[in-house]
Amino acid sequence: MADKLKIGVIVGTTRQGRFADTALEWFEPKIAARTDLDYEVLDLRDFALPMFDEAAPPAAKPVTSPAAQAWEKKLLEFDGFIVLTAEYNHSIPASIKNAFDYAFKGWYRKPLGTVGYGGVGAARAVEHLRMIAINFGMVPVRGATTIGGADFVAAMQGKPASEWGDHLDAPTTEMLDDMVFWGNAAKTAKG
């Protein structure tokens, strides 16, 4: 049997009162139950990345910011990523875009899964993130988890996940299965 994949679960919003903590609390038991992968939570709050101000993109030249160097080094530890994202003004939060802009090798040829949340389940943000990921040579997986509409409202009202999240188990399992498939395919191809 192949080594377990190591997946970075990125908490993508950094604002006070963020819903990301609720989404992570719901999602983490799902990924923790998997026997075919390991994971680590990467909270963007913990990396203190400055706004991107490098002379060239990381694909062309190594970054100079010590925080960005630590970020890229951390990303290199993983076989794929799942980003928990809100939708801000029909797109991803600036914190996620900035985190992508500060790295290249850490993202390259790895699968990307998403857990989106908001009024429409962050559908537009998820699609935008998938387009960004392709630019980094990533494989955005088909499966996705979207916490939207009535589910999002119920969660915001503090209702337990058992009242709003059980029907999200199937798409979450599909996304995690896709992550394992594409993560193993990428590892095999890279040798």
Question: Where do the protein language model's features map onto the residues?
Answer:
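Short, flexible coil/linker segments at domain boundaries that flank nucleotide/cofactor-interacting
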Residues: A2-D3, W107-R109
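Short, proline-centered helix/strand-breaking motifs
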Residues: T85-A86, P111
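Short, well-ordered alpha-helical segments in soluble proteins
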Residues: A103, W107, A133-G137, G183, ...
